[in-house]
Amino acid sequence: MALRFPRFSQGLAQDPTTRRIWFGIATAHDFESHDDITEERLYQNIFASHFGQLAIIFLWTSGNLFHVAWQGNFESWVKDPLHVRPIAHAIWDPHFGQPAVEAFTRGGAFGPVNISYSGVYQWWYTIGLRTNEDLYTGALFLLFLSAISLVAGWLHLQPKWKPSVSWFKNAESRLNHHLSGLFGVSSLAWTGHLVHVAIPGSRGEYVRWNNFLDVLPYPQGLTPLFTGQWNLYAQNPDSGSHLFGTSQGSGTAILTLLGGFHPQTQSLWLTDIAHHHLAIAFIFLVAGHMYRTNFGIGHSMKDLLEAHTPPGGRLGRGHKGLYDTINNSLHFQLGLALASLGVITSLVAQHMYSLPAYAFIAQDFTSQAALYTHHQYIAGFIMTGAFAHGAIFFIRDYNPEQNEDNVLARMLDHKEAIISHLSWASLFLGFHTLGLYVHNDVMLAFGTPEKQILIEPIFAQWIQSAHGKTSYGFDILLSSTNGPAFNAGRSIWLPGWLSAVNDNSNSLFLTIGPGDFLVHHAIALGLHTTTLILVKGALDARGSKLMPDKKDFGYSFPCDGPGRGGTCDISAWDAFYLAVFWMLNTIGWVTFYWHWKHITLWQGNVSQFNESSTYLMGWLRDYLWLNSSQLINGYNPFGMNSLSVWAWMFLFGHLVWATGFMFLISWRGYWQELIETLAWAHERTPLANLIRWRDKPVALSIVQARLVGLAHFSVGYIFTYAAFLIASTSGKFG
């Protein structure tokens, strides 16, 4: 008999019910649980799968370049970035009638197209690409990298090319190579690209392989580098009247510290960006030579951690035992990596709009909104994943003997204090913030808006003032016109920063008031509650007073049977599951706030946000309802328009979201009865009963139904808001 799916678990393969299929899919990537897995095969499988991941990423990015080159309007967009709509790709749909064809034929195209809201046009333009041929070249190169990645993945599964476990656990070598090779060399290479291709491109000089060695990016070449006159590279920067992509108003500097934004493109100065990447390259190239490998010099990670004992002896044994704990636990390493990546992704969201690096992207409002929202949601999923793998570490990999009285053990020892403090903070934030909002709602409902409780964010305004924002009148640090910091700032460092901070046309340090104070605390409530659920899930993963033997039941278990009351919903997986709802909720508030604040800024009516954001009805009526008008009227008996697809997606997103509750609210018994009735009917229906299946149909397990419900809730929620965001922004600003 042929091997049945799943081949990695013979026990599951022999299951006579449909559970075999769903559990097989659920555990396909849990290599640790597979039959006859060894530590060596585990590491090798994960290593090989990374190359597959890279191949997919390169193929996807290649596809972006290829479709824009083939079906887009990059060359005409380059000529007029502010008025031509960038096309992502063509749409072919047999359902389109003539009105639809006309509605979606935009951006100078000959047929229906999708408009690009990803910012890739601005990025490619900034880094020096100018023609469709450039895009095709990039697409081919990435396709080549994709093929190389696939070959590398296959190669590293062959016996002669499989790395050993000791190679995977050589932390110092990995750190050195990742710091120097991955970050250092790539940052240096990127600096080279910016200096040799992008900066000349921004000054109207087209540099490619055929003239790459003939065009000096700086008139004196490398002379200032070797003579120690590095400051020459910053002299004669582009002027404030520089027209991007032309020589008009351009300078010769390549590495500057101007600060602020290019007046025409509203993006960071390319020469500042090149300088930044050079500094990053230098730091990481040095950092990549810090750890001891073949030559007996440098730090040993183990020695560093063993030596890190807090003074006074009141904090236990510090980091003793951590090296082996981390180095032998893939879940711990993954948890750390996801936590770092999650924070970085959220920082990307914050900085892409406040300090835009790509030419003209600040004036593409829909892309700005889409990119912010996209990166915040991605960050949320990655961060919750960090805690999930932290909890799995505690269940599968944590060894109490190896970690006696170190920081990990002490976290577990103090978990009641940690969890109760987080609980207290969440309760305080929740009751006070909601109390203020509801009080203000009631005052408006009773016709006495002057009785609202409005709190000025004095401390936050003071911090903004310290960084140079003068409108609050604090006269402190950089906003004090006669202070030494202010005077130094005008000449020595970042002279453009102060003018940028005080220019109301960008998103740097937006003016804040009582509405911002309230929504910041609502977001703080969401962050603390999400953290509470995640931290509790990880710290209670091994056991709690209620269920001391919890670790023996694994990461995800529904309950310990009917005989032991109160053990349902307390697995570490359940904590992750609940936290994702809170995470989505919190990021909802974050993106609502960002979007509404910016819509009013871009429309020039900031008073609408300031007046309506201090009470809940204001958010519901003046943000959600008012901005959804295009979606609830996207197509009607009188015809359709280019927003119709978003109106349809808005409805579809609601449908997916609502379907989630079907899985979340009704449990297994209901579905089992329904399935058995349907199977009975199927077997007695002519023609239909010719189709048979081997597996007995059974309802999803409790945990699986929750996962399916959560997936529908998350996807539907994001689809719905994405449609709302893009339609409401593009409907106003194009």
Curated annotation (Swiss-Prot):
Chlorophyll a B3 binds at M662, Y670. It comes from Piper cenocladum (Ant piper). Its EC number is 1.97.1.12. It is an enzyme of class 1 (oxidoreductase). The keyword Oxidoreductase applies. This is Photosystem I P700 chlorophyll a apoprotein A2. It catalyses: reduced [plastocyanin] + hnu + oxidized [2Fe-2S]-[ferredoxin] = oxidized [plastocyanin] + reduced [2Fe-2S]-[ferredoxin]. [4Fe-4S] cluster binds at C559, C568. Keywords: 4Fe-4S, Chlorophyll, Chloroplast, Chromophore, Electron transport, Iron, Iron-sulfur, Magnesium, Membrane, Metal-binding, Oxidoreductase, Photosynthesis, Photosystem I, Plastid, Thylakoid, Transmembrane, Transmembrane helix, Transport.
